[in-house]
Amino acid sequence: MNQKAIGRRQFSVGLGAAALGGFNLAQAQGEGRIVLGQSAPFTGPSAQLGIQFNLGAKLFFDRLNAQGGVGRRTVEIRTMDDGYEPDRCAENTRKLIADDVFALFGYIGTPTSLAALPIFTQAKVPFFGPFTGAEALRQPFNRLIFHVRASYYDETALIVRQLTNLGLKKIAVFYQNDAYGKAGLDGVTKALADLKLAPVATATVERNTTDVKAAVDKLVPAMPDAVVQISSYGASAAFVRAARKAGFGGTFYNVSFVGTQALADELGKDGAGVVVSQVVPSPYQPSRQITREFL
């Protein structure tokens, strides 16, 4: 096995992931560092998703590097801003691969990750830890993609089970009008169909906007018990406020991609009763070993 393959295997072990060493991938960096490429939103309405993910990753890698890195090589993240726009993400991906990053890491979102998919697949560059649960990145299987999150199908199935167990069976869906939102809608619809139910209403919002009036006008008259939101924090917060102002008295459930802290910050006191599902351990439960490491 060549040195490049050995390096990738050491890197993946350092992250606690499956080995990346078997691929003939982008050129490894010099002996002193491993450079990961991240395209994510660092500006615009979804900026906090990219900013917070990057800060968390840097916190881990700073600790890893202080302990000697991976095979005595430090790990660095090279970031590029895509504003949560697929075309910009695709261009960033081409540039990062041209710059010979070791792997792509921490991409934010479904439409952006799907834009990068054919590019990194053709280049045979690993795609590690995307912040998305889209089924389109899981089926068909792609040996270059390494997931660390549950799928949206799994997440929405548990949301629907929770709601119906509480007797809340009239469920509406507010979703982003792109691959992410449609993946979440499909998950909710499938979970309801398994119970011989269907959404009482659905409505959309465009990506990177907060124009929710049409969605409120469509969903509130359907009188749902709950609204499952498949959007980013800005649009979700706008919908919560507008729906309540229009007289909706039900509950709101969000998938984890919404950005829990960002949504809480956006809503402030209006966040009471808004639920966000989680697919990773809570950082606020010190009984867990991984949480103690984080703290």
Name each model-derived stretch:
Residues 33-50, 107, 171-174:
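Short beta-strand segments enriched in small/hydrophobic residues
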Residues 2-19:
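N-terminal secretory signal peptides and thylakoid transit peptides that target proteins
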Residues 96, 100-108, 128-130, 172-175, ...:
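Periplasmic-binding protein-like
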Residues 25-38, 69-74, 164-167:
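Immediate post-signal peptide segment of exported/extracytoplasmic ligand-binding proteins
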